[in-house]
A protein has these predicted regions:
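Short, linear, compositionally biased motifs with a strong N-terminal bias
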Residues: 14-15, 83
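Bacterial N-terminal signal peptides that target proteins for export
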Residues: 1-12, 19-20
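Exported/periplasmic ABC-transporter solute-binding proteins
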Residues: 23-49, 53-70, 79-82, 86-249
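Local alpha-helix boundary/kink/capping signal
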Residues: 15-17, 218
């Protein structure tokens, strides 16, 4: 079911469609954790394609899929997990021939900068009352965190402490503001908030974190969309992703 918030986001995309049609604007729906990297890559691509403007729609991967399924005018879809793009492919929402992995990442446990949290085992202790993580239904980082906690036998015991978030950046904000004692985010997100949060531990026990990307099957400008997907594999784009802390595909 698409919530009111998701409908509003979709409406914004639809209302702008007629305007974008008169300019060469490429709309890229990307996982929230890719936001900083995509914005840094944009001017590099635009410099090679005069007259082209990249527009980014950033949200949790599951929300992006819902928007696309509801008819959002999108050209490229980049998610934070393979499963979401698999579902997009099953619904024939993407061109499978254009699919590729653009980057990898790691899951980390973070705490406020001044916290004395010692590790994952400390999450069950009395000093930790709130733990933020993405909603597993729509946020891949939340699913990775659940897999990790299940593999450690902590998932059930920690249920009363869990604070669900709409995306991984919201988790980061909760931790940075000290509203929770801990949270699960990507290593790249933690690096972007250095000084406000600290990495307590790198988390294992989950599926590999890969970021796949593909051209949307209903793109109004598929050639340009393919060019952008190909550009993401270029040395220039990969250098930006590496600088942002992402791993190689």
């Amino acid at each position: 079911m698409i919530t009111l918030v998701h409908r509003c986001a979709l409406a914004v995309l639809l209302l702008g469609a007629s305007t974008w049609a008169h300019a060469q604007t490429l709309t890229v729906s990307a996982a929230a954790s890719l936001g900083d990297a995509m914005k840094a890559i944009a001017p590099l691509f635009e410099a090679q394609h005069p007259g082209v403007t990249l527009r980014f729609n950033l949200a949790a991967s599951g929300v992006l899929l819902q928007q696309l399924a509801a008819g959002a005018p999108v050209d490229v879809l980049a998610t934070a997990d393979e499963d979401t793009l698999d579902r997009a492919a099953a619904q024939k929402l993407i061109d499978p021939a254009t699919r590729r992995v653009l980057a990898t990442n790691a899951l980390v446990l973070v705490a406020p900068a001044g916290s004395g949290l010692a590790g994952l085992d400390a999450l069950t202790g009395p000093s930790v009352k709130r733990i933020a993580l993405g909603k597993s239904a729509s946020v891949p980082a939340g699913r990775y965190a659940q897999q990790a906690l299940e593999s450690r036998g902590q998932w059930s015991a920690l249920q009363p402490k869990l604070v669900p978030a709409d995306n991984v950046r919201q988790v980061l904000d909760y931790v940075a503001r000290g509203e929770v004692e801990a949270g699960f985010v990507y290593a790249t997100d933690a690096a972007s908030a250095a000084g406000k949060v600290r990495v307590v531990a790198t988390v294992g026990g989950h599926a590999p974190i890969r970021y796949p990307v593909a051209v949307v099957s209903t793109s109004a400008q598929p050639a340009l969309a393919r060019a952008f997907v190909q550009f993401l594999a270029s040395p220039a784009a990969q250098a930006v992703l590496k600088q942002q802390g992402f791993g190689a595909p």
